């Protein structure tokens, strides 16, 4: 069988996804004891893993370095990539929200300034609402922007809401729910069809049996 290379994102999503691979019989022991390594071979299958930053997973898949990738839907929404989105894994569930200080008025007709790491998603959301806003792109922690008067509100991913609460912010609008997705390189889906669909089908059955 041909080798299948899977790109995973480091961090929180990785911890959600490793159990799914183990449940379909793919050994992930090296991943769980990785140290500083970034490339891993499953001991009992033809699968290898690479660990990269979340924003780079889709790029590795698009260019064929990885056959399969596991990435948050937020990355796919913000960055258009020429890949196939095959499966919603149902883990890593979060939501995009509009949040601000308690005195914020989302119904104000004044043009709002919105700080975010996700300008494309934010622009699309407000365009669909028919609302013209100024978007301020921030790379670091966006929670501070309303507190310092840089922006009226923020658009960010919320999981538990603890970070917002600690900074005195509240959610005003829930925009989109997101989760981890399995993506596939278009060429690999033709040349390694059997191997890739075997993983997809087993993963899908595991997800369905767990519901």
From Swiss-Prot:
It is found in: Cytoplasm. Heteromultimer composed of HisG and HisZ subunits. The lineage of its organism: Bacteria, Bacillati, Bacillota, Bacilli, Bacillales. It catalyses: 1-(5-phospho-beta-D-ribosyl)-ATP + diphosphate = 5-phospho-alpha-D-ribose 1-diphosphate + ATP. This is ATP phosphoribosyltransferase. Belongs to the ATP phosphoribosyltransferase family. Short subfamily. Its EC number is 2.4.2.17. Pathway: Amino-acid biosynthesis; L-histidine biosynthesis; L-histidine from 5-phospho-alpha-D-ribose 1-diphosphate: step 1/9. Lacks the C-terminal regulatory region which is replaced by HisZ. It is an enzyme of class 2 (transferase). One of its GO terms (cellular component) is cytoplasm. Keywords: Amino-acid biosynthesis, ATP-binding, Cytoplasm, Glycosyltransferase, Histidine biosynthesis, Nucleotide-binding, Transferase. It comes from the Bacteria. Catalyzes the condensation of ATP and 5-phosphoribose 1-diphosphate to form N'-(5'-phosphoribosyl)-ATP (PR-ATP). Has a crucial role in the pathway because the rate of histidine biosynthesis seems to be controlled primarily by regulation of HisG enzymatic activity.
């Amino acid at each position: 069988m041909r080798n299948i290379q899977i790109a995973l994102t480091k961090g929180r999503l990785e911890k959600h996804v490793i159990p799914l691979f183990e449940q379909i019989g793919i050994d992930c022991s090296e991943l769980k004891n990785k140290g500083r390594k970034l490339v891993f071979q499953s001991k009992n299958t033809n699968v290898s893993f690479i660990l990269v930053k979340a924003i780079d997973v889709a790029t590795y898949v698009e260019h064929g370095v990885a056959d399969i990738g596991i990435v948050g839907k937020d990355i796919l929404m913000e960055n258009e990539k020429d890949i196939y989105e095959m499966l919603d894994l149902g883990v890593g569930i979060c939501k995009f929200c509009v949040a601000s200080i308690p005195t914020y008025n989302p119904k104000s007709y004044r043009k709002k300034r919105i700080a975010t790491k996700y300008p494309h998603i934010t622009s699309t959301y407000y365009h669909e609402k028919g609302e013209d806003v100024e978007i301020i792109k921030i790379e670091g922690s966006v929670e501070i922007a309303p507190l310092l008067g840089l922006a009226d509100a923020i658009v960010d991913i919320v999981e538990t809401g603890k970070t917002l609460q600690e900074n005195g912010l509240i959610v005003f609008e829930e925009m989109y729910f997101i989760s981890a997705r399995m993506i596939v390189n278009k060429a690999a889906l033709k040349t390694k069809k059997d191997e890739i669909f075997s993983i997809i089908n087993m993963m899908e059955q595991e997800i369905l049996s767990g519901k």
